[in-house]
Structure formats: C-alpha cells, structure tokens
Amino acid sequence: MGVRVHVVAASALLYFILLSGTRCEENCGNPEHCLTTDWVHLWYIWLLVVIGALLLLCGLTSLCFRCCCLSRQQNGEDGGPPPCEVTVIAFDHDSTLQSTITSLQSVFGPAARRILAVAHSHSSLGQLPSSLDTLPGYEEALHMSRFTVAMCGQKAPDLPPVPEEKQLPPTEKESTRIVDSWN
C-alpha cells in the first residue's frame, strides 16, 4: 500500500508541474477548449502541493524510524533502564505524624484533632517490636499491618468525640416541631 501512495503522489506532482508549464495561446480557435488558467501565479495551489509533499516526507521519516526501533528491540539491543527499587521504611512510633498534625491544627481545626485521635488509637493497638535492629525486608513489610482491622462481626471501637464535634441530637419534641414547621 505504501508503494501505491508514493506512485499516486509522484504522478500528481508530475501532473501539476507539466500543467504549470503549459500556456494557452492567444490565437486559440475554440475558446471553450483553450486553457486560460495561469498555474504559475496561483500561489495557494503550490502551497497545498508543498504541504502535501512535506506531510509525505514526515510520514516516510516516521515509518523508517519505527522500522529501525522495532528491529533494535527484536534484536535485544534496546538496553532500557533497570527496574525501579522500592524502599519501605517502618517507624516504631507516630511522632512524625503527631508533630505534623499538631502543626496543622490551626489550618484543619477539629479534623486534625480527629486524625490525631485515630493515630493515637492505632499506635497503641499494634506497635512494631522494639528489638528490631534493622529495617524489615520488602516482603516482610508487605505482610506487616500498620492498622488493626476489625473482623467481620466485630464492632470497631468508638473514639471519643472532639469537643468541637459534640452536638446534642435534637430531642423527639424538637424534631416533631421541625417537621411541623415545614408543613
């Protein structure tokens, strides 16, 4: 198919070149059969021809580039970057988390205190053994659990509410009063 496209493009280019060289004679016998267009002065036609030729050239260049790259990859010459290594660091305590949340309390308000309460509750449930001298390996770190998850059927422990979040639910009389006011 690529050869067919090249032949068609070359024949069209040759046709325009030959057509531009022909001029109509002034003493034409039948004006209907006479070519009166001066192709040399029609710059927009030549612009389209040049753009088409440039697109064809870019297509050929990209095709050659792809063929070269694919042949290199099949031959095994492509020495890509080595795979990434992941380092997992385990902390014995959440002091970094606590200091971060404490410093951001002014920005986040009660939400930061709630996160801090969750961090405290989880850090007291499962600490890493302090006898570890070195950091665990990657496989060991994958199997470690940082947070305790409640088993199916168990209820997660309730955290005490933050003072800003304490709001008394409306009593039954107040809720009926609110419903009546809507009606």
From Swiss-Prot:
Chief place of localization: membrane
InterPro entries assigned to the protein according to its UniProt record, in alphabetical order: TMEM52
Residues of the signal peptide: 1-24
Pfam hit, one: TMEM52
Biased composition (Basic and acidic residues): 163-177
Region described as Disordered: spans on this chain: 158-183
GO CC list: extracellular exosome; membrane
Annotated transmembrane regions: 40-60
Keyword terms of this UniProt record: Membrane, Signal, Transmembrane, Transmembrane helix
Alphabetized PANTHER family for the sequence: TRANSMEMBRANE PROTEIN 52, TRANSMEMBRANE PROTEIN 52B
Protein's name in the database: Transmembrane protein 52B
Protein source organism: Homo sapiens
Higher taxonomy: Eukaryota, Metazoa, Chordata, Craniata, Vertebrata
Gene: TMEM52B
